[in-house]
From Swiss-Prot:
Similarity remark: Belongs to the cytochrome P450 family.
GO biological process: bone morphogenesis; cell fate determination; cellular response to retinoic acid; central nervous system development; cornification; embryonic limb morphogenesis; establishment of skin barrier; establishment of T cell polarity
Matches recorded under CDD domains: CYP26B1 (cd20637)
Assigned GO CC terms: cytoplasm; endoplasmic reticulum membrane
Protein name per Swiss-Prot or TrEMBL: Cytochrome P450 26B1
Job of this protein: A cytochrome P450 monooxygenase involved in the metabolism of retinoates (RAs), the active metabolites of vitamin A, and critical signaling molecules in animals. RAs exist as at least four different isomers: all-trans-RA (atRA), 9-cis-RA, 13-cis-RA, and 9,13-dicis-RA, where atRA is considered to be the biologically active isomer, although 9-cis-RA and 13-cis-RA also have activity. Also has a significant activity in oxidation of tazarotenic acid and may therefore metabolize that xenobiotic in vivo.
Length: 512
């Protein structure tokens, strides 16, 4: 018994020694990791590097960021201020909040900073995209792509977008069970991007398969750039390869078939615009361009669409006020008689309260956290040096949350954007859901158009209710969305705002 007791004590002592050694090793390695990045400060500048933590060697604070969500930024902002350092997705990073700080970064493009997304995003989106280009190449690409989002182009997309949304809402209402709004919003925006924006005639089964692959692609755009079996980065690369093959097939089929078209889609405009600027696009450039267009139209718009539905659920008075505006303009048409082309751009621009609702959704629930830049030369920000070679991420969502121009920032209040209040009129960098400067989101007008049409159709044709006891919490990666997707039951409404019976709904669906 004595020897057995001694053996147990010895084993426990060995285990304790191992734990102490591991703890010390982690502490020492973490301290060396901090010193390694502290040594990169620009010694010619007397200002200190921003405060913050670089986390653990190699992985930095990526784990904390993924687990804490919005709490990651807010907790560190409270501890370190509006400018702090961290290490995310395999790179050192300085995160920046506040209108004046963000303004300096956005207006310093090409002089102080240059765009550089995390390595995973650069590789997966491809080298020929607008997002990954810089300097003159970026300027030229924006000129080519800008025609896709012109007023004339948006007017031509509008009837098709409205029809896709009408069909989708009718399908949602015909479901006997609640739907996962975020997942279905992704399907909707993917269908809109592929069928309407790009004009691809992909069979329904192939479209469904392509959607599943695209989900895998989007989920891993922001991942640790470690190319190992079963890693998110590897899954993203595999998804990109499958998508590129599918897109090439669709592009070739589309280029060979020019009959029966009643409008110019984005791919037509892109090809024509590139020719006008003296450069015919290669197949690889077309594949990267279409992949970027789908990415831009898909993930962020699905996020904003889900947020719109959730806020209309939470605030029935807002939905009723929206219906009153539509009724006054003769646009509360009901779902009993679906038709294409009842909306025009001038009609939508005249709906002031609708515009306020969309603006407030984008303020409070901005789909993306911010934008990435690489520092070209050391500069000062909020009393700190931002060293050359470091990466900077300006935070859109946190700038909205801390903007002094907005009253009760956590309250969903569309009227803050009304003409009577115009809380956003003082300083354009307090409100920037689509970024700013020379890299303002090219597709912002298409995104707002889609959200407005969705809101009009929701108010006109649907009654919807939350299928769970409470609203879900929100996560931020890869874009803002509810953790459970938001479970909602939809019911169709007729032209008198009366609920359509299930058998009538089935008959309507069968005729479409």
């Amino acid at each position: 018994m004595l020897f057995e007791g001694l053996e147990l004590v010895s084993a426990l002592a060995t285990l304790a020694a191992c734990l102490v050694s591991v703890t010390l090793l982690l502490a020492v390695s973490q301290q060396l990791w901090q010193l390694r990045w502290a040594a990169t400060r620009d010694k010619s500048c007397k200002l200190p590097i921003p405060k913050g933590s670089m986390g653990f060697p190699l992985i930095g604070e990526t784990g904390h960021w993924l687990l804490q969500g919005s709490g990651f930024q807010s907790s560190r902002r409270e501890k370190y201020g509006n400018v702090f350092k961290t290490h995310l997705l395999g790179r050192p990073l300085i995160r920046v909040t506040g209108a004046e700080n963000v303004r300096k970064i956005l207006l310093g493009e090409h002089q102080l900073v240059s765009t550089e997304w995390p390595r995973s995003a650069r590789v997966l989106l491809g080298p020929n995209t607008v997002a990954n280009s810089i300097g003159d190449i970026h300027r030229n690409k924006r000129k080519v792509f800008s025609k896709i989002f012109s007023h004339e182009a948006l007017e031509s997309y509008l009837p098709k977008i409205q029809l896709v949304i009408q069909d989708t809402l009718r399908a949602w209402s015909s479901q006997p069970e609640a739907i996962n709004v975020y997942q279905e919003a992704q399907r909707l925006t993917f269908r809109m991007a592929v069928r309407v924006l790009l004009g691809f005639s992909i069979p329904e089964e192939d479209l469904g398969n392509l959607f599943e692959v695209y989900q895998q692609f989007v989920e891993n755009v922001f991942s640790l750039p470690v190319d190992l079996p079963f890693s998110g980065y590897r899954r993203g690369i595999q998804a990109r390869q499958i998508l590129q093959k599918g897109l090439e097939k669709a592009i070739r089929e589309k280029l060979q078939c020019t009959q029966g078209k009643d409008y110019s889609d984005a791919l037509d405009i892109l090809i024509e615009s590139s020719k006008e600027h003296g450069k015919e696009m290669t197949m690889q450039e077309l594949k990267d361009g279409t992949l970027e267009l789908i990415f831009a139209a898909y993930a962020t718009t699905a996020s904003a669409s889900t947020s719109l539905i959730m806020q209309l659920l939470k605030h029935p008075a807002v939905l009723e006020k929206l219906r009153e505006e539509l009724r006054a303009q003769g646009l509360l048409h009901g779902g009993g008689c679906p038709c294409e082309g009842t909306l025009r751009l001038d009609m939508l621009s005249g709906l002031r309260y609708l515009d306020c609702v969309i603006k407030e959704v984008m303020r409070l629930f901005t789909p993306v956290s911010g934008g990435y830049r690489t520092v070209l030369q050391t500069f000062e920000l909020d009393g700190f040096q931002i060293p050359k070679g470091w990466s900077v991420m300006y935070s859109i969502r946190d700038t909205h949350d801390t903007a002094p121009v907005f009253k009760d920032v956590n309250v969903f209040d569309p009227d803050r954007f009304s003409q009577a209040r115009s809380e956003d009129k003082d300083g354009r960098f307090h409100y920037l859901p689509f970024g700013g400067g020379v890299r303002t989101c090219l597709g912002k007008h298409l995104a707002k158009l889609f959200l407005k049409v969705l809101a009009v159709e929701l108010a006109s044709t649907s009654r919807f209710e939350l299928a769970t006891r409470t609203f879900p919490r929100i996560t931020l990666v890869p874009v803002l969305h509810p953790v459970d997707g938001l479970s909602v039951k939809f019911f169709g409404l007729d032209s008198n705002q009366n609920e359509i019976l299930p058998e009538t709904e089935a008959m309507l669906s069968a005729t479409v």
